[in-house]
């Protein structure tokens, strides 16, 4: 009897276990999905010269669909810094899309001095290609000087080049560097014709849709609007009064005050398109036109649209971070972003695209503005001629100094020919520079280990140094100082005003929220790579922002 009961119990237990396993097998999800989950489209947006604090300085005046939507529906890495110096446009776009730094990707400035060629080299110059879409030389450009791959290149390779990559900006470098080496099309603005152009690196002729877009002659239509403030000028309480003496005037204007009259430039001076906030509207209209024309997000593979908005940089340089012009530009940009996001929702579908927005660098306050009891000033550029005289008097050699990107470059051939002591010339140069107003320090770039400066600054200089392209001595300016003789302002320093940038992600795969952990510009490409399940770019040193992953 006991044996019989035991057998019955075991049978019941076995059947129950088997049924449970069957039920479990039915509901157990597959560990490995049948296809790789990816968004239909990735949109990368770079706002040229956007300081991080602009997110919040104008927050109360933004609508709900632009910057506020990014902050409230997306993820914000609030403490994202640039890990190198100099902080310039070409360096920023390269580092965002490569996950790298100038030391590795080779883009150490907008220009740099090439000792072998004996001249300055422009970051995307390429005399081996031709302009497409114009008879000008504005299209003699390509990404050949970029020494590593971009996240856009890696996406193309990951899909055996089925994914499409389209890149657009008013600035050539703002379109070319994000697009990488393998973009299907990179388009930038030609000042001579008022049209978007490209180069034979990408194509032999412009697509029909680009010709149709150019045929609208939108710059002339924007010029007809002139530039008045979007709201009554007295409501611009986040800015200084209009028309400050340290602001630059537009060509032909007697004052820097509103309104700015652009009708005079129609059919004459197309370069002015970049200097008005409508330059951003113009670029985004082109980006919107590219989506249906190139069937972006409809190819069955993840496509990539890279958009860099340049007018914020032109306005910032001319008027400075505290101007009404700058505030008005960002209020207009906020409306443009809302329109663009709504267009993406309609054409690609909300939740079907991944979007990130960041900046290539920030900006220092105008030196004239800082005269109001704050440290800062203008470093006069006569340093170069003074140095030349000093070294000649001491060593009887003309070093033919070049000062670019805060770096001093010597003519080493002239030094060798004169049999002068290179080390002593370098030290004399450093001794002279550290005595100048506005210079915090001057350091031997090739001997950074012996330099007594904070490690954070040292790391940024090292990350910006490329052995084949960089100079001999790096000049570190005092906070708030900028090397210029003209009104307006600039950027290039290690300081937070130049290196603290927004980093916002929204849409597919992104968990809404924010973090104040320290991240870097070079972390953006690895994060996008992780979301797309593709290899990081070949020179990437960044890390994934795991806080935003769903």
Curated annotation (Swiss-Prot):
Gene3D superfamilies: 3.30.1360.150, Alkaline Phosphatase, subunit A. Zn(2+) 2 binds at residues 313, 317, 491. Its EC number is 3.1.3.1. It catalyses: a phosphate monoester + H2O = an alcohol + phosphate. Zn(2+) 1 binds at residues 48, 89, 360-361. CDD domains: AP-SPAP. SUPFAM superfamilies: Alkaline phosphatase-like. PANTHER family: BIS(5'-ADENOSYL)-TRIPHOSPHATASE, ECTONUCLEOTIDE PYROPHOSPHATASE/PHOSPHODIESTERASE. This is Alkaline phosphatase PhoV.
């Amino acid at each position: 009897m006991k044996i019989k009961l035991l057998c019955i119990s075991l049978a019941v237990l076995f059947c129950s276990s088997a049924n449970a396993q069957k039920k479990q097998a039915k509901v157990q999800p597959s560990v490995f999905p049948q296809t790789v989950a990816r968004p239909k489209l990735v949109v990368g947006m770079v706002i040229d010269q956007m300081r991080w604090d602009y997110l919040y300085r104008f927050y109360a005046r933004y609508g709900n669909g632009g910057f506020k939507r990014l902050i409230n529906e997306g993820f914000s890495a609030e403490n994202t810094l640039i890990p190198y110096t100099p902080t310039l446009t070409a360096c920023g776009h390269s580092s965002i899309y490569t996950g790298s730094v100038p030391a590795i990707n080779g883009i150490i400035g907008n220009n740099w001095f090439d000792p072998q060629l004996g001249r300055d080299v422009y970051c995307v110059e390429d005399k081996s290609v031709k302009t497409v879409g114009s008879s000008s030389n504005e299209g003699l450009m390509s990404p050949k000087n970029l020494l590593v791959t971009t996240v856009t290149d890696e996406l193309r390779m990951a899909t055996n080049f089925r994914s499409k990559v389209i890149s657009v900006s008013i600035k050539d470098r703002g379109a070319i560097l994000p697009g990488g080496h393998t973009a299907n099309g990179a388009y930038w603005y030609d000042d001579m014709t008022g049209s978007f152009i490209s180069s034979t690196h990408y194509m032999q002729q412009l697509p029909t849709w680009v010709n149709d877009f150019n045929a609208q002659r939108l710059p002339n239509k924007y010029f007809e609007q002139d530039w008045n403030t979007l709201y009554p000028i007295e409501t611009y309480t986040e800015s200084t009064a209009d028309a400050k003496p340290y602001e630059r005037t537009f060509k032909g204007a007697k004052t820097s005050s509103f309104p700015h009259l652009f009708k005079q430039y129609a059919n004459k001076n197309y370069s002015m398109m970049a200097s008005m906030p409508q330059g951003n509207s113009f670029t985004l209209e082109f980006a919107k036109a590219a989506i249906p024309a190139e069937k972006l997000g409809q190819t069955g593979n993840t496509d990539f649209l890279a958009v860099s908005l340049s007018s914020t940089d032109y306005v910032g340089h001319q008027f400075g971070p505290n101007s009404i012009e700058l505030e008005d530009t960002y209020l207009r940009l906020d409306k443009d972003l809302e329109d663009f996001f709504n267009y993406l929702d309609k054409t690609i579908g909300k939740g079907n695209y991944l979007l990130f927005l960041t900046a290539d660098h920030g900006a220092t306050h105008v030196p004239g503005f800082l005269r109001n009891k704050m440290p800062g000033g203008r470093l006069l550029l006569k340093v170069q001629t003074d140095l030349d005289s000093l070294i000649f008097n001491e060593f009887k050699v003309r070093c033919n100094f070049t000062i670019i990107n805060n770096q001093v470059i010597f003519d080493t051939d002239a030094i060798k020919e004169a049999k002068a002591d290179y080390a002593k010339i370098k030290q004399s140069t450093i001794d002279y520079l550290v005595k100048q107003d506005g210079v915090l320090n001057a350091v031997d770039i090739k001997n950074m280990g012996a330099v007594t400066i904070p490690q954070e600054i040292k790391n940024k200089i090292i990350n910006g140094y490329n052995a084949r392209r960089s100079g001999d001595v790096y000049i570190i300016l005092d906070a708030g100082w900028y090397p210029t003789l003209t009104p307006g302002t600039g950027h290039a320093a290690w300081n937070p005003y130049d290196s603290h940038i927004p980093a916002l992600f929204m849409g597919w795969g992104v968990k809404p929220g924010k973090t104040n952990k320290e991240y870097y510009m070079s972390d953006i490409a690895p994060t996008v790579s992780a979301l797309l399940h593709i290899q990081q770019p070949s020179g990437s040193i960044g890390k994934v922002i795991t806080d935003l992953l769903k």
